[in-house]
């Protein structure tokens, strides 16, 4: 499977560590991982130095259709199966990219625990029904997503963003 991680700022905070961990875990399992970003930083440098494919392009809400078209072109060219968006803006662009390349599925992980303004609540109501999966990294994050316009039944909480292997229980 070809997975593209989509993040605006490829810096060095918790979300970036989450993306890097997933890229390491899934590439070790034989998946092909790509990183698409707007603003370079430690994550993009690390990922590039480790040999992962990287794609830098301009992303903004004002130029969402242009960004979506560029993203779709990259996905088509690289036969991307899944776009994993990390924040609301990236999610909107990923969903819009499906207008130009329908084969891709979109997974959205919310790392935010902030209440959004009316504009984003409306955008969440319009766009999140098209996500194939929506992940919150904590219960509070899920509750805030609901208040931000995401339907409760669409959200799955995966603590720390990576589902751990279940330990065998001995009686």
What are these regions (language model features)?
Residues 1-171:
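Membrane-interface segments of envelope glycosyltransferases acting on lipid-linked substrates or membrane lipids
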